[in-house]
Amino acid sequence: MEKKYKLTEETFAVDGHVLHRIKALRDFGNVKKGDLGGSIEEEYNLAHDWNCWIYNDAVVRGNATVCGNAEVEKKSAYG
């Protein structure tokens, strides 16, 4: 499976969790290569397949996973 995003060097902490900003590595869905997305704690928080994406300042951390064609905007998801 080809990765669709990478973790950038841009990080910040929330409630003791270190979050990484994501950057698209290829075009998919409404996302273009080079687009910056929201932030995740680990790669399992956002699937590399399908068209799912985390936008802007949205955060996904803990055991939460975004997959399928789900889009996360302006909120946090954690489990």
Each model region followed by its residue ranges:
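Terminal amphipathic alpha-helical/low-complexity segments used for targeting or macromolecular assembly
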Residues: 1-51, 69, 75
